[in-house]
Amino acid sequence: MRRFVLALFIGATVSTSAQKVGLVLSGGGAKGITHIGLIKALEENNIPIDYITGTSMGAIVGSLYSMGMSVEEMANLLKSEDFSQWSSGEIPPELRYNYHNATPKPTIVELPFSLNGKRIDSLQIKARFLPTNLVPPHQMNYAFVPLYAQATAAAGGDFDKLFVPFRCVASDVYKKEAVIFRKCQLGDAVRASMTFPFVYKPLTIDGRLLFDGGIFNNFPVDVMQNDFKPGFIIGSVVSENPDKPTESDPFSQVMVMIMNKTNYSIAKNEGFLFNFKLDDVDMFDFTPVDKLIKMGYDSAMVHQDTHLPHF
């Protein structure tokens, strides 16, 4: 009798574990808004999301959901004027008095230098200022504090204690390795994960200068497998490995130089992959929110009966 009860208990435990679902969200800039539509479809089909891992825009969407935001709340945030301002670095006119404004000059580009040493021919000339980012970081840094502070405090900085256990990935370019965030300020982790080189200013955490997680791991399915070991993995990919660069496209040249190739795949016996082809979507254009959400939703609904788990 005891063996029978024990067998039932073990069977129930295995069954419960096997039903756990992990959601992996790739980076891809504004294309990652598509992830929200996929989440909406999963919710409507009563498919639970037990764990989330994400990179860059996948980290933003994943973190918002992991701290309890609904699909509607995420969509409204991305369509808000506040989001537009902190993603572009634009400072509202009524707040500009809080910031130092440089004296207007007729120059297009100015690179001030300082001399370190008495002799110029010693080549001890160091740049005092060179721009490290195109988008000013102030708006984003200020916005992330109230956005993520409550969730961080409630979880005690432990991502396992969020509404949905969560991981995100950034890149340490000095050590040339991915950095997995499990415990820290949630806003800092997300901010580091989405810091695309030259667009956003890098963040220093624990002495490490961190950039966009997509440099070394743009689709953290391995993090999902190693940290959570779910019974079924749903992947959402809105990016692809860079094409061969061309002479006339400096952006493609930079992408090839900084981005490692990512394995965008999930084994058939481990889950299902949604691979969205969004070639006509600008990764820095965050305006077509409803369109991208609908694309993610429609694609998921097509595959719900044949490829997704049933509960």
Model-predicted segments: where are they?
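Histidine- and/or cysteine-centered catalytic micro-motif in compact active-site loops
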Residues: 1-3, 238-239
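Patatin-like phospholipase
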Residues: 17-55, 63-311
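Sec-dependent N-terminal signal peptides
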Residues: 3-16
